[in-house]
């Protein structure tokens, strides 16, 4: 296995930059950079990181921009004068904290070195160039450290995906979902199903391969019961309304309604900045304006849309209305706004057909009508009564959005399907599982279960036929 390295922290100015090296030559590289040999595992050392003499004097070594000149007042004590009269020294890169992790007790399961330098672009460039000029070490590919950890059985594929989701998490709920997955929540669920499938296979293989053995007929009843339970569990699990995927990607919220009812003002309020033009002129918003928001820990993708009205002679506005209706139909949550002064005239069939259980109906500009009309609206329409301009009852909008988001993507005891890859293999697994029947040839029936187990194994990255043999010898005394 090759030795690889990369900067694990973001490139740029920061308090600390972290570099990771993994592979059989990790310790040797650390010794070369520091001139020290006696590194004990899992102990932090404060060391000078230098460009080795062989690299400084090599014609192949050249810094990329920005050019960093040698700092002569920081030469190592081993500086000597070469035969040509020039200075030959180890160039100091930085004073850093370093730590060595011995295989297999590391993130990747290999020998690993971490170097913690100051977060300087120049330091990063110098150290990366120094590492690139050392023999038998190369720059890591994207995700290669995590890939090596998976290959060394540090975690399964779902946990690896959980780590990626954790890095990309922007809200508390996304963090909670990612940390549960990275900690093995999905692995435990899928492995439990796979263990039951392997048990079924081992029982059926015993019937097929050892027909003369005294195997009780009740075993087939156990197979049927386990099969039935698995079909129900996986079917119910797939029927989750994409809760985990919604939490990962964000819930789309479309703000729709007739022209000039305050949709753009509401978008600006929710975003806490002016991203949409607000005007008294109807039809100001022509295209969809999008913003991202965290409400109650849930990622919300806001979309302000063109005002919907039945008649418009403007071709561009007509296209905007089409896009608004499409946005509403594909949205997870909808806010439909009306003007309190023009309520009866602004309600049209196109808008009313968009209302469902995940719709928040809002009557805006409530401050512009008489109190007796407010009571009339309360009796006629189930909605929120607000004034975006004067900040009246706007907190109720946020609370309603949070409640719907929680209902659609809130936590349950069972971990969610978090991406399409899992859903794809689970659908395949269920297809093979429902095809299974003991009325069929036992060899074919066993193959259906085997394919189901392989689909589950493809999710976690574990596919091993030897496990089936292990189950057979574990549960039966063959050839006693």
From Swiss-Prot:
Gene3D superfamilies: P-loop containing nucleotide triphosphate hydrolases, Probable tRNA modification gtpase trme, domain 1, tRNA modification GTPase MnmE domain 2. Its cofactor is K(+). GTP binds at residues 260-265, 279-285, 304-307. Residues 250-406 form the TrmE-type G domain. Keywords: Cytoplasm, GTP-binding, Hydrolase, Magnesium, Metal-binding, Nucleotide-binding, Potassium, tRNA processing. Binds 1 potassium ion per subunit. It comes from the Bacteria. (6S)-5-formyl-5,6,7,8-tetrahydrofolate binds at residues 20, 114, 154, 480. One of its GO terms (cellular component) is cytoplasm. Its main location: cytoplasm. Transmembrane segments: none annotated. GO terms for molecular function: GTP binding; GTPase activity; metal ion binding. K(+) binds at residues 260, 279, 281, 284. One of its GO terms (biological process) is tRNA wobble uridine modification. InterPro entries: G_TrmE, GTP-bd, GTP-bd_TrmE_N, GTPase_MnmE, Guanylate_kin-like_dom, MnmE_dom2, MnmE_helical, P-loop_NTPase. Mg(2+) binds at residues 264, 285. Disulfide bonds: none annotated. Its EC number is 3.6.-.-. It is found in: Cytoplasm. Belongs to the TRAFAC class TrmE-Era-EngA-EngB-Septin-like GTPase superfamily. TrmE GTPase family. Homodimer. Heterotetramer of two MnmE and two MnmG subunits. Exhibits a very high intrinsic GTPase hydrolysis rate. Involved in the addition of a carboxymethylaminomethyl (cmnm) group at the wobble position (U34) of certain tRNAs, forming tRNA-cmnm(5)s(2)U34. This is tRNA modification GTPase MnmE. It comes from Rickettsia felis (strain ATCC VR-1525 / URRWXCal2) (Rickettsia azadi). The gene is mnmE.
């Amino acid at each position: 296995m090759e030795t690889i390295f990369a900067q694990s922290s973001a490139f740029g100015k920061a308090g600390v930059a972290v570099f990771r090296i993994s592979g059989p030559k990790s310790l040797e590289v650390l010794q070369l950079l520091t001139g020290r040999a006696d590194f004990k595992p899992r102990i932090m050392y404060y060391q000078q990181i230098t460009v080795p003499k062989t690299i400084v004097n090599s014609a192949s070594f050249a810094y990329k921009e920005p050019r960093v000149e040698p700092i002569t007042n920081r030469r190592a004590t081993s500086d000597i004068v070469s035969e040509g009269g020039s200075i030959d020294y180890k160039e100091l890169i930085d004073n850093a904290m370093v730590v060595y992790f011995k295989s297999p007790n590391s993130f990747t399961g290999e020998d690993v070195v971490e170097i913690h330098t100051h977060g300087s672009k120049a330091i990063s460039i110098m150290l990366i160039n120094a590492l690139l000029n050392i023999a038998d070490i190369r720059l890591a590919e994207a995700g290669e450290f995590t890939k090596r950890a998976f290959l060394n059985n540090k975690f399964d594929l779902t946990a690896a995906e959980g780590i990626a989701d954790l890095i990309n998490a922007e809200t508390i709920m996304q963090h909670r979902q990612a940390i549960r997955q990275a900690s093995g929540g999905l692995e435990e669920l899928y492995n439990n199903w796979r263990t039951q499938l392997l048990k079924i296979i081992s029982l059926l293989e015993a019937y097929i391969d050892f027909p003369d053995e005294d195997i009780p007929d009740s075993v087939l009843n156990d197979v049927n019961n386990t099969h039935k339970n698995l079909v129900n569990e996986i079917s119910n699990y797939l029927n989750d309304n994409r809760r985990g995927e919604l939490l990962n990607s964000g819930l789309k919220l479309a703000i729709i309604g007739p022209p000039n009812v305050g949709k753009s003002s509401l978008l600006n309020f929710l975003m806490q900045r002016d991203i949409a033009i607000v005007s008294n002129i109807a039809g100001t918003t022509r295209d969809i304006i999008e913003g991202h928001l965290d409400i109650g820990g849930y990622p919300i993708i806001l979309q302000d849309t063109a005002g919907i009205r039945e008649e418009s002679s403007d071709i561009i506005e007509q296209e905007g209305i089409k896009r608004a209706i499409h946005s509403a139909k594909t949205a997870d949550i909808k806010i439909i706004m009306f003007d309190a002064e023009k309520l009866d005239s602004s309600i049209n069939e196109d808008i009313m057909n968009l209302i469902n259980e995940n719709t928040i109906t809002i009557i805006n500009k409530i401050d512009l009508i008489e109190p007796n009309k407010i009571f009339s609206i309360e009796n006629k329409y189930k909605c929120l009564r607000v004034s975006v301009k004067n900040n009246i009852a706007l907190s109720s909008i946020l609370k309603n959005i949070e409640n719907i988001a929680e209902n659609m993507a809130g936590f349950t005891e069972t971990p969610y399907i978090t991406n399409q890859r899992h859903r794809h293999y689970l659908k395949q697994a269920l297809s093979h599982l429902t095809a299974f029947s003991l009325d069929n040839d036992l060899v074919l029936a066993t193959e259906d279960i085997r394919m189901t187990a392989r689909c589950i194994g493809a999710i976690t990255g574990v596919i091993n036929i030897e496990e089936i043999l292990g189950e057979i010898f574990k549960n039966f005394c063959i050839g006693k």
